[in-house]
UniProtKB/Swiss-Prot annotation:
Lineage of producing organism: Eukaryota, Metazoa, Chordata, Craniata, Vertebrata
Effect of residue 522 to Y: In CSNB1B; abolishes expression at the cell membrane
Gene: GRM6
Signal peptide interval: 1-24
Outcome of substituting residue 58 to R: In CSNB1B; abolishes expression at the cell membrane
Main localization, broad class: membrane
Family to which this protein belongs: Belongs to the G-protein coupled receptor 3 family.
Protein name per Swiss-Prot or TrEMBL: Metabotropic glutamate receptor 6
Residues in the Cytoplasmic compartment per record: 609-622, 674-697, 771-783, 846-877
Residues holding L-glutamate: 154, 175-177, 225, 307, 400
Extracellular-facing ranges: 25-585, 644-654, 719-748, 807-819
SUPFAM superfamilies named among the record's database cross-references: Periplasmic binding protein-like I (SSF53822)
Length: 877
């Protein structure tokens, strides 16, 4: 908010002596261009560079200084020559040199407020008197400045704006872009025809994102322009997301020797951040490029320069190879043909109003006008005055000329609108505009809208900012030569980015956009593990084992019946396997089973054929057929174990797995028990023991077997059989080897449970075989049964560790099934081989031995009771 008039009075009085001092100094220096007019505009231009120590001003700046100053003179000439714009009113000017220094510019700007200060105070108010009390002589009153065009650098504009606002003098800058100047509470009289760096920063963020970069460093010259620009870039990138700042480096205002080499070393601390965002002045840009070349990093950094770089050749002169690929941004502008015609016709004769033009002439044509000229080298030729710009020297219109012209026209249009409102129908100034109210003029300035010198609309928002419109350039080599290259337009930005990515060229592969990423993209089947505090950086973690990639941040385990795809980007069904007929694991047990069935069938057929022969009768025909049936079932169970699991097959497995062994061992147990009881009874009495008849033996055998049958039937009823697919059995470390196993719903323990009862019978039978090992030779089956049981026990003792020891194997289904069926077939083969193969051999090949023997052993006669009559007596033979 502006200060009230009373509050400003003491400040105005305090500034009065400074204004006098400034006037005196300016008069001595003759440091301004003056044009007479009814309304005077001020102008601030960096005609000279910053001076060395002890000097305010340095070398002449031909383009940024003289071109821009002449652009204002050109614009004033056009406005004053336009009968439709401010008719009867001539605009004058007072143009000052800021020498590219904010403090010096502030001293210069005090001349703009002299008229206002003089209007507020006089010699009586400040007590200034000459000897004798005579008032001092005062110079002619200065012209009243109604508005100021300038300054160039943001730091200069900020310094000047703080003074001009005190006196309500509107200010329009043609080049100051610092976001700080958008603060209308502090710089309420400041406007600009160039967009603020906040727009430029947004455009640069959009460029970075369009190139696919997410990890960049920033480089700023110390001061309002550089620091504010980087701050805006960082803030916008943080709000937009997806772009992280690796390094944020500030170049000191007065850099020490080796400072720029240090900057390059710091940038290389994060080598993946190849994109470098630069908000720096021309000199700093040049020295950064030089340091990059000295470090042999040509082509490593990907420069994105602000409008201070723009499309200028001076920052990259002789450094083109380092600048190849640099993307720069510049407020949308056009070359003004009328200014080119105007400036190229300027000469020493027709441009005496510009007090710096003679110095420009010497600098531009490398000559000297007088012995006191600025060109002090004795070898420099003398200027003839006939030199011509563009003919005898190179000429290219400076980039901000358009904006200087637009700034002048903005003030002219505002004054014209104000004149129409306050002086309707009046030619020339009316009393209502003498003096011109700065606050009212500011309102008219903010309301202007017209097509500028380049044909683009000129307007201001509530903060005095122009809309953001930028051209985007890239420095590209020509035919492989960087030195002969140039800036090529590759896009535009006006609230949204339009970038022709295909038109971009880069060192290395010209058409492949280089990367500036903290971390490379993760491959298929990998998730991002973010680095804490740096959202653009991550580590890639493989979704290993049975996990698959859900999204870029998450891995999850596949469902139990599935396994991941080879690249772990999804899940697929796990293949289902079973022990098939063609499996190598099924061949040995099937071969044994077939041979066993053939052998068993042969024995049974032989026994049936020779049913009434002594050997068959002596074997106990009834129990032999029961035992052979059990052996046959044992062999047959192999086919059930290999068959595809289903409800019927699973039920048959449960029922017959233990039935064959139970039937066999029940018969063997009954036989050994009968022999043992006969032998023991004979020791005590001649009376035979009970239940030794064939019928009794069958009853005992079937009674023992019925327990197994009843148990199995009860199990079938309690838990109906069905097949399942077990995905855990072959869930290997390598998912590619994982398989689902189709099998019956029987655990390892339940499988052994089916055989548990028969194993108990086997152990009991073995115990009786041991007890009966001392029976007389007349009981010719005692010893074969004993050998059978011993061997069977050994087989099953070997079976148990193999069966349970492979429980964790990937080949479990094959090993356990094969082990079980082979063990069953071997135990059946032992029984068949020990008990019946010898008898069959005698029956078939030695029939002469298949006769009833009459002799008895004397020992047997004297120690054993008489055996029962009939075929049981044959067992004694």
């Amino acid at each position: 908010m502006a200060r009230p008039r009373r509050a400003r009075e003491p400040l105005l009085v305090a500034l009065l002596p400074l204004a006098w001092l400034a006037q005196a100094g300016l008069a001595r220096a003759a440091g301004s261009v003056r044009l007479a007019g009814g309304l005077t505009l001020g102008g601030l231009f960096p005609v000279h560079a910053r001076g060395a120590a002890g000097r305010a001003c340095g070398q002449l700046k031909k383009e940024q200084g003289v071109h821009r100053l002449e652009a204002m003179l050109y614009a004033l000439d056009r406005v004053n020559a336009d009968p439709e714009l401010l008719p009867g009113v001539r605009l004058g000017a007072r143009l000052l040199d800021t020498c590219s220094r904010d403090t010096y510019a502030l001293e210069q700007a005090l001349s703009f407020v002299q008229a206002l200060i003089r209007g507020r105070g006089d010699g009586d108010e400040v007590g200034v008197r000459c000897p004798g009390g005579v008032p001092p002589l005062r110079p002619a009153p200065p012209e009243r400045v109604v508005a100021v065009v300038g300054a160039s650098a943001s730091s200069v504009s900020i310094m000047v704006a703080n003074v001009l606002r005190l006196f309500a003098i509107p200010q329009i800058s043609y080049a100051s872009t610092a976001p700080e100047l958008s603060d209308s509470t502090r710089y309420d009289f400041f406007s600009r025809v160039v967009p603020p760096d906040s727009y430029q920063a947004q455009a640069m963020v959009d460029i970075v994102r369009a190139l696919g970069w997410n990890y960049v460093s920033t480089l700023a010259s110390e001061g309002n322009y550089g620091e504010s620009g980087v701050e805006a870039f960082v803030q916008i990138s943080r709000e937009a997301g997806g772009v992280c700042i690796a390094q944020s480096i500030k170049i000191p205002r007065e850099p020490k020797p080796g400072e720029f080499s240090k900057v390059i070393r710091r940038l290389m601390e994060t080598p993946n951040a190849r994109g470098i965002i630069i908000f720096a002045n021309e000199d700093d840009i040049r020295r950064v490029l030089e340091a990059a070349r000295q470090a042999n990093l040509t082509g490593h950094f990907l420069w994105v320069g602000s409008d201070s770089w723009g499309a200028k050749t001076s920052p990259i002169l002789s450094l083109e190879d380092v600048a190849v690929g640099a993307i720069t941004i510049l407020p949308k502008r056009a070359s003004i043909d009328g200014f080119d015609q105007y400036f190229m016709t300027r000469s020493l004769e027709n441009n005496r109003r510009n007090i710096w033009f003679a110095e420009f002439w010497e600098e531009n044509f490398n000559c000297k006008l007088t012995s006191s000229g600025t060109q002090s080298d004795d070898s420099t030729r003398k200027c003839t005055g006939e030199e011509r710009i563009g003919r005898d020297s190179t000429y290219e219109q400076e980039g901000k000329v358009q904006f200087v012209i637009d700034a002048v026209y903005a003030i002219a249009h505002a004054l014209h609108s104000m004149h129409q409102a306050l002086c309707p129908g009046h030619t020339g100034l009316c009393p209502a505009m003498e003096p011109t109210d700065g606050r009212m003029l500011l309102q008219y300035i903010r309301a202007v809208r017209f097509n500028g010198s380049a044909g683009t609309p000129v307007m201001f928002n509530e903060n005095g900012d122009a809309p953001g419109r930028y051209d985007i350039f890239q420095y590209q080599a020509t035919n492989g030569s960087a030195s002969s290259g140039g800036y090529q337009a590759v896009g535009q930005w006006a609230e949204t980015l339009r970038l022709d990515v295909e038109a971009l060229q880069w060192s290395g592969d010209p058409h492949e956009v280089p990367s500036s990423l903290c971390s490379l993209p993760c491959g298929p089947g990998e998730r991002k593990k973010m680095v804490k505090g740096v959202p653009c950086c991550w580590h890639c973690e493989a979704c290993d084992g049975y996990r698959f990639q859900v999204d870029e941040f998450t891995c999850e385990a596949c469902p139990g019946d599935m396994r991941p795809t080879p690249n772990h980007t999804g899940c697929r069904p796990t293949p289902v396997v079973r022990l098939s007929w063609s499996s190598p694991w099924a061949a040995p047990p099937l071969l044994l089973a077939v041979l066993g069935i053939v052998a068993t069938t042969t024995v049974v057929a032989t026994f049936v054929r020779y049913n009434n022969t002594p050997i068959v009768r002596a074997s106990g025909r009834e129990l032999s057929y029961v035992l052979l049936t059990g052996i046959f079932l044992i062999y047959a169970i192999t086919f059930l174990m290999v068959a595809e699991p289903g409800a019927a097959v699973c039920a048959a497995r449960r029922l017959f797995l233990g039935l064959g062994t139970t039937l066999s061992y029940s018969a063997l147990l009954t036989k050994t028990n009968r022999i043992y009881r006969i032998f023991e009874q004979g020791k005590r009495s001649v009376t035979p023991p009970p239940f030794i008849s064939p019928t009794s033996q069958l009853v005992i055998t079937f009674s023992l077997t019925s327990l197994q049958v009843v148990g199995m039937i009860a199990w079938l009823g309690a838990r109906p059989p069905h097949s399942v697919i077990d995905y855990e059995e072959q869930r290997t470390v390598d998912p590619e080897q994982a398989r689902g196993v189709l099998k019956c719903d029987m655990s390892d323990l339940s499988l052994i449970g089916c055989l548990g009862y028969s194993l108990l019978l086997m152990v009991t039978c073995t115990v009786y075989a041991i007890k009966a090992r001392g029976v007389p030779e007349t009981f010719n089956e005692a010893k074969p049964i004993g050998f059978t049981m011993y061997t069977t026990c050994i087989i099953w003792l070997a079976f148990v560790p193999i069966f349970f020891g492979t429980a964790q194997s990937a080949e479990k289904i094959y090993i356990q099934t094969t082990t079980l069926t082979v063990s069953l077939s071997l135990s059946a083969s032992v029984s068949l081989g020990m008990l019946y193969v010898p008898k069959t051999y005698v029956i078939l090949f030695h029939p002469e031995q298949n006769v009833q023997k009459r002799k008895r052993s004397l020992k047997a006669t004297s120690t054993v009771a008489a055996p029962p009559k009939g075929e049981d007596a044959e067992a004694h033979k």
